[in-house]
A protein has these predicted regions:
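Short coil/turn connectors between adjacent alpha-helices in alpha-solenoid helical repeat scaffolds
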Residues: 16-19
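Terminal, non-catalytic domain-edge segments
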Residues: 11, 23-42, 53-172
Length: 172
């Protein structure tokens, strides 16, 4: 929810001026700080033989999705844009620095020839990345889940890899 709140306040700040803009910018900042508390600042150790460890996955910069199922995934959408904007708005480089960490982390599992990330299908990007012992009953720690939601996964990566789109669109 905090990711959505920070993004919504960011959009409203972009569309506002004066005191109203400052108000929404402040809300975006508060929500972003809370959202960042769900992002990994370290790399989860994987045992030898676990696929994610074998391919060298680094969890730093990935978001922990929920307390219920405790997996990481690419759920980012415009949040990196929010962080870069907050960095400029408040002269706080830590926001942009962590946006860069998130961006590099999300790119790790983009499959291309010679780098299939343990997946046999070109173009597949997993929705659920199991970094803990909890899972939905398929695979477990160190593996991907078989569940795949291509719509939002593609949309999220599209936004991540298209920096500045909201500012360009709302600024028209």
């Amino acid at each position: 929810a905090s990711l959505y709140a920070s993004t919504a306040a960011y959009y409203l700040a972009l569309a506002s001026k004066g005191a109203e803009r400052a108000h929404y910018a402040g809300l975006a900042k508060k929500a972003a700080y809370f959202a960042l508390s769900w992002y990994y600042t370290w790399d989860v150790p994987f045992a030898p033989g676990q696929m994610l460890g074998d391919i060298g996955l680094k969890t730093r910069g990935w978001g922990n999705v929920s307390v219920e199922n405790n997996h990481i995934d690419v759920f980012i959408f415009d949040f990196a844009d929010v962080l870069r904007w907050l960095s400029k708005e408040y002269n706080e480089p830590r926001f942009a620095d962590f946006a860069a960490v998130i961006s590099s982390s999300m790119r790790q599992l983009l499959p291309y020839e010679g780098h299939q990330c343990g997946i046999a299908k070109k173009g597949y990007y997993p929705e659920v990345v199991q970094h803990t012992n909890w899972d939905y009953g398929k695979n477990g720690k160190g593996y991907y889940n078989h569940i795949f939601a291509p719509g939002w996964v593609v949309a999220s990566l599209w936004e991540l890899l298209s920096p500045g789109r909201p500012e360009e669109f709302i600024g028209r």
